[in-house]
A protein has these predicted regions:
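Autoinhibitory propeptides
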Residues: 1-31
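Subtilisin-like serine protease catalytic core
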Residues: 30-60, 68-112, 126-131, 160, ...
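Substrate-binding/access-modulating region of protease and related hydrolase catalytic domains
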Residues: 36, 102-187, 205-208, 222-231
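Extracellular S/T/G-rich loop segment that most often corresponds to the catalytic His/Ser-adjacent loop
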Residues: 45, 56, 183-231
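Glycine-rich, acidic and aromatic/proline-enriched surface loops and short helix-turn segments
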Residues: 49, 87, 120-126, 193, ...
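Active-site/binding-pocket entry motifs
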Residues: 49, 64-65, 90-91, 103, ...
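Short pre-catalytic strand/loop immediately N-terminal to key active-site residues, enriched for Gly-Thr
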Residues: 65-74, 225-231
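Residue-level detector of anion-binding/catalytic polar loops
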Residues: 96, 164, 219
Length: 231
């Protein structure tokens, strides 16, 4: 739900994000002069709303679900993720965002749309100077094997090209072997949640230890899909 008092929400958001940053030692990175400036991130998700906190951050938007040309997010998850990444109080403030909508208003999507987006990124990552790929999408390992192999192949190829690929462990835990695709790739960085029992658990079916990193994943306040709103 949306908070009506924007100033209060900003303060609460700042406190929560500060605690999240502290828990993963992000401040050590900031002290060495690093931020999100001059770093471009590709985000595969539900899209993005042009929130004022993302002014100047959204470099490009492509809609593989509805074919629209202007930015939108009919679910909210993509905007929430983009806020965590690039908003003023985000983890990498000022990072450039290349947003690819591959999930619909229910947060569901076709593997074929993710494959098309990944192919586009592979063909254009050098030209667009994309350094990081945030893959919020998670497909069950038991899903279509041929499509799964295509996604993993593209993900691994992007990693070999120098793109740091970060994927969620998924929300099908806490049973073993519940990490989703492409988080099961042996090459990429898979992130799980240390405060959500549903977070995917390893190992993978190839006996790879996953996830590599745990971070806060529950009740994180970020940007909403209306200006001045936070969720």
């Amino acid at each position: 739900s949306y908070c009506e008092n924007e100033s209060y929400t900003k303060l609460k958001n700042k406190i929560i994000m500060k605690n999240a940053k502290y828990s993963i030692n992000a401040n050590l990175v900031y002290k060495n002069g690093y931020s999100g400036k001059n770093v471009n991130i590709a985000v595969l998700d539900t899209g993005v709303f042009k929130h004022k906190q993302l002014d100047g951050c959204i470099k490009h938007f492509m809609d593989f679900v509805g074919g629209k040309e202007t930015c939108y997010d009919d679910n909210g998850h993509g905007t929430h993720v983009c806020g965590i990444l690039s908003a003023d109080i985000g983890m990498a403030p000022g990072a450039g965002l290349y947003v690819f909508k591959v999930l619909d208003y229910l947060g569901m999507g076709q593997t074929s749309d993710s494959i098309r987006a990944l192919k586009y990124i592979k063909e254009n990552c050098v030209r667009l100077n994309i350094k990081i790929l945030n893959f919020s999408v998670g497909y069950l390992p038991c899903s279509d094997t041929a499509e799964r192999i295509k996604i993993l192949k593209l993900i691994d190829e992007l990693w070999d090209m120098g793109v740091v690929v970060v994927a969620a462990a998924g929300n099908y835990g806490p049973s073993p072997f519940s990490v989703t695709v492409p988080g099961i790739s042996r090459k990429i960085i898979t992130v799980g949640s240390f405060d959500d029992i549903r977070s995917g658990k390893g190992p993978t079916d190839c006996c790879i230890v996953k996830p590599e990193i745990l971070a806060p994943g529950h009740d994180i306040i970020s940007l909403g899909t209306r200006d001045g709103t936070y969720v």
